[in-house]
């Protein structure tokens, strides 16, 4: 009996939905089986994204080493994970106090992390510090602090665990970076510079360690769209927030502004992408909506056009305030 043509589209939708559901279930099962018994180190685990990531890996049976700058928040996350899990299916997380802004003690912390289980299977570098201000208002000390947290801290930790991975000829680095590691915007000089630097380091590392069976994944995302995911306080800058909602006069920037607050990524989505990247050993993931994606291509293919548009946005007073 022939299927009426009017039923073809609904049937295709049902079939597609079923395949999509089965695919997601299979991938979720594979993700859990891949991370089970793996030693996973998460930096800044107390952030919104870090805690979501910790929950997913903990539920998957990973042996977690949770790092963060606040012991109280680490203990709170520890209690949350342990109270909502089956002890027979999960491992008790280990906690390590880690503050990349204090580089003097970083070598001791790296040793403590390595001694937790004697090995590291997955290192997730999630720590980040943000600052937005005109370059003339940023001190050199602030530049150094940003570089410590966003660059020197992660690479010091990576170098510390690398010998363990080389000895075992297995391991994975996951860098949770920012779109500004590929696309620099005004009023974010030191932040964008640190993100470009750490991106370059892990890109180079990927080629160097592949022969040892070690993989490197970088995840570049737009801003994290969640109230709990606030930037780490930096310093009091002379920039004063303006309550005005003036619209940029440049039509291109007016469109961009209308998308700035709607094109973020949630901590939950980002954490799920990290688990998938570990499962698939993805080399590079770009987690962004169309506007920043198009901007990235314009920057690569038509740099002159990109620079002109960005400069026009800075000259536009309303746009400059929103960029800040």
Swiss-Prot record:
Binding site for NAD(+): 41-65
Residue positions of the active site: 191
Sorted UniProt keywords: NAD, NADP, Oxidoreductase, Secreted, Signal
Positions of substrate binding: 178
GO molecular function, one term: oxidoreductase activity, acting on the CH-OH group of donors, NAD or NADP as acceptor
Pfam families: adh_short
EC identifiers of the protein: 1.1.-.-
CC per GO annotation: extracellular region
PROSITE patterns linked: ADH_SHORT
InterPro entries: NAD(P)-bd_dom_sf (IPR036291), Sc_DH/Rdtase_CS (IPR020904), SDR_fam (IPR002347), SDR_family_member_7C (IPR052148)
Cleaved signal peptide residues: 1-17
Family: Belongs to the short-chain dehydrogenases/reductases (SDR) family.
Protein name: Dehydrogenase/reductase SDR family member 7C-A
Organism name: Danio rerio (Zebrafish)
């Amino acid at each position: 009996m022939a299927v009426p043509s009017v039923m073809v589209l609904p049937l295709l939708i049902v079939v597609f939905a079923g395949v999509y559901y089965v695919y997601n279930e299979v991938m979720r099962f594979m993700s859990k089986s891949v991370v089970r018994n793996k030693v996973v180190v998460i930096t800044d685990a107390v952030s919104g994204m870090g805690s979501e990531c910790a929950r997913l890996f903990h539920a998957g049976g990973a042996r977690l080493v949770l790092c963060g700058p606040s012991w109280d928040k680490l203990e709170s996350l520890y209690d949350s994970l342990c109270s909502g899990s089956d002890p027979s299916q999960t491992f008790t997380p280990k906690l390590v106090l880690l503050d990349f802004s204090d580089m003097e003690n970083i070598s001791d912390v790296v040793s403590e992390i390595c001694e937790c289980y004697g090995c590291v299977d997955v290192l997730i570098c999630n720590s980040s510090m943000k600052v937005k201000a005109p370059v003339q208002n940023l001190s050199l000390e602030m530049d150094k602090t940003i570089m410590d947290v966003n660059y020197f801290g992660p690479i010091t930790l990576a170098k510390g665990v690398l010998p363990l991975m080389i000895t075992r000829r297995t391991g994975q680095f996951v860098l949770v970076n920012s779109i500004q590691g590929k696309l620099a915007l005004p009023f974010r000089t030191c932040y964008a510079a640190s993100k470009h630097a750490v991106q370059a380091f892990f890109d180079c590392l990927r080629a160097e360690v592949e022969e040892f069976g070690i993989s490197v994944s970088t995840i570049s995302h737009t801003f994290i769209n969640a109230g709990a995911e606030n930037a780490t306080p930096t310093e009091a800058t002379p920039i004063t927030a303006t309550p005005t909602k003036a619209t940029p006069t440049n039509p291109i920037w007016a469109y961009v502004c209308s998308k700035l607050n709607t094109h973020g990524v949630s901590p939950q989505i980002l954490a799920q992408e990290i688990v998938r990247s570990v499962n698939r050993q993805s080399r590079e993931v770009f987690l962004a909506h169309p506007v920043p994606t198009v901007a990235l291509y314009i920057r690569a293919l038509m740099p002159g056009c990109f620079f002109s548009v960005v400069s026009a946005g800075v000259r536009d007073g309303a746009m400059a305030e929103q960029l800040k």
